[in-house]
Design a protein with these regions (language model features):
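DHp/HisKA histidine-phosphotransfer helix
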Residues: 5, 38-43
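Conserved C-terminal segment of the DHp
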Residues: 23-34
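Short alpha-helical segment of the dimerization/phosphotransfer core of two-component systems
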Residues: 48-53
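A conserved signal-transducing helical linker
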Residues: 1-7
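Short alpha-helical N-box/ATP-lid segment at the N-terminus of the HATPase_c
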Residues: 54-65
């Protein structure tokens, strides 16, 4: 993998990771003050970002033809 490819991969992973971190922090700070709907939305966003990271990892570990 070239340096350019590694840089793109790091960026592609960092984006959803930032989403996970941000929403997790909001859940942590809003404990007891967030509505059930907000909590559900934050958890949905975290799960979507985690799936996105999983898809990226699957894409780079899949054997190439």
């Amino acid at each position: 993998m070239t340096d350019e490819e590694l840089h793109k991969l790091a960026h592609d992973l960092r984006t959803p990771l930032t989403v996970v971190e941000g929403f997790a922090r909001m859940l942590e700070r809003g404990e007891g003050r967030l509505s059930p709907e907000d909590r559900a939305e934050f958890l949905t966003r975290i799960l979507e970002a985690a799936r996105q990271m999983g898809d990226i990892i699957d894409g780079i570990t899949r054997p190439r033809a």
